[in-house]
A protein has these predicted regions:
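Bacterial Sec-dependent N-terminal signal peptides
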Residues: 1-25
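Histidine-/acidic-rich catalytic cores in large beta-rich domains
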Residues: 21-432
Length: 432
């Protein structure tokens, strides 16, 4: 369902949505297909298909989106007509249209092992306008897996989110509480920069691991012991949920047969997927990366101007802070400030900087999916944030020890709240 507003276009598909305003030949190049049903059953809600709003105020351009569980990407015009289709070889999650008409997308590797938790990908591909595979890079094995989202940098490199496997013993040594450690260990997130090489190759030229930026106040004997309230630049390793009681293998088998379990989900890895990074963007002017963790109800900014060695530490780079968080927003409880009334984000997706030349350029927008509502069902909102910076452009803490702002500079939500809700995924982009 797509809704159009004077300064914001919202894509509200159950898929990862991306937008394009590039030039395209306004001609349907897709083959004729049978007419689909008039509505689609989404969680018991029968949502009408097709174009919903097309007002005179619509912004010129096209909309690009992927179809869940298919290998196709579509470009549609503002009349809802298909302009072009790119066809890949695996189920696609999301992607970005390039100036040459190609798509860079992430797709689900058919054989990825170990990991489970939603958003699994494992492959990043470049597909030409005429659907020829130009690059097919696999980042999936028993030690790591690319998932959810990636960003295309101006130099053609790719910044990709990935899980990495840590054994239960490694997690114990990092100071996590025993009741928060699954038998299979944990899968903390990392970010890798990939330089494409040939038709299938890629070189990792930079990387950042959240594992290197943990703090905990549980075990005084561990190297990362400290007070999280004094170090908002680090992540409290004991924030999160305790491990649920382990179910039997028979029960897990039933869940798999019912389609209610992820492909590699086992009784032993329940709770292994902890932070669930689900969106990433790059700002070339700042040389900074922003990413989202709905499990933490926070968005984070880190410095990309570091070397990989500096990114693993607390010094270096343009900021002088290495790979530590430069900024975070959404839930100050995670660094022991405030209470539940200070939580701003609930299962959010699609963090991004507003582009140059558009209202609010340099600000951030985020889609807040699942805002609690005691009187009715949850609802969604889009926030525009202006992170406070000093005269040198450095993010700073407010007097109460938290990162601002206290409130977004702009908010969109439905007047009745109920008519605007995306239970997961979803996104927003400032258009004009």
């Amino acid at each position: 369902m797509k809704k159009k507003y004077p300064i914001l276009s919202l894509l509200f598909f159950i898929s990862i949505g991306v937008f394009s305003q590039g030039n395209a030949n306004d001609k349907d190049t897709s083959s004729k297909k049978p007419e689909p049903p008039k509505d689609r059953n989404m969680f018991g809600l029968h949502i009408p298909r097709g174009l919903k709003v097309n007002s005179p105020d619509v912004t010129d351009g096209y909309v690009l989106f992927a179809v869940p569980n298919s290998a196709s990407f579509y470009l549609v015009n503002r009349r809802g007509e298909v302009v072009h289709e790119w066809k890949g070889n695996y189920a696609v999650l999301g992607g970005y249209l390039q100036n040459d008409g190609s798509i860079i997308q992430n797709a689900v590797d058919p054989d990825f092992p170990v990991f489970a938790g939603g958003g699994e990908a494992g492959r990043i591909q470049k597909i030409s306008w005429d659907s020829k595979m130009q690059w097919d890079f696999e980042y999936a094995n028993e030690e790591y897996l690319h998932h959810h989202d990636f960003a295309v940098m101006p130099n053609g490199h790719i910044l990709a989110i990935a899980w990495e496997d840590k054994t239960a013993q490694e997690v114990v040594m990092a100071g996590r509480k025993p009741n928060m450690i699954p038998k299979a260990g944990l899968w903390p997130d990392k970010i890798v920069e990939i330089e494409p090489d040939g038709a299938r190759g890629g070189k990792i030229v930079w990387e950042w691991h959240i594992w290197d930026h943990l703090i905990q106040d549980y075990d005084t004997k561990k190297m990362n012991y400290g007070k999280p309230a004094d170090h908002p630049e680090l992540l409290d390793f004991n924030v999160g949920d305790t491990v649920p009681p382990m179910i039997s293998q028979d029960s897990m088998d039933v869940l798999h047969k019912q389609g209610r379990a992820w492909r590699n989900q086992t009784p032993e890895n329940e709770g292994s997927e902890v932070y669930h990074f689900n969106a990433i963007k790059y700002n070339a002017d700042l040389d900074q990366i922003v990413f989202s963790s709905p499990n933490l109800s926070e968005i984070f900014i880190i410095d990309h101007s570091t070397t990989t060695k500096e990114a693993a530490g607390h010094k270096g780079g343009r900021s002088g802070k290495g790979g530590d968080f430069l900024y975070r927003w959404g839930n100050p409880q995670n660094y022991h400030h405030g209470d539940s009334t200070d939580e701003k984000l609930f299962g959010q997706h699609d963090i991004r900087w507003i582009e140059k030349g558009k209202p609010g350029e340099g600000h951030l927008t985020v889609f807040d999916n699942d805002i609690p509502n005691a009187a009715h069902m949850p609802y969604s909102a889009v926030y525009e944030l202006s992170p406070p910076v000093d005269t040198k452009g450095n993010y700073f803490l407010e007097k109460n020890g938290t990162f601002g702002p206290e409130k977004p500079v702009w908010v969109y939500m439905a007047p009745d709240t109920l008519s605007f809700w995306g239970s997961f995924v979803s996104g927003a982009q400032r258009m004009a």
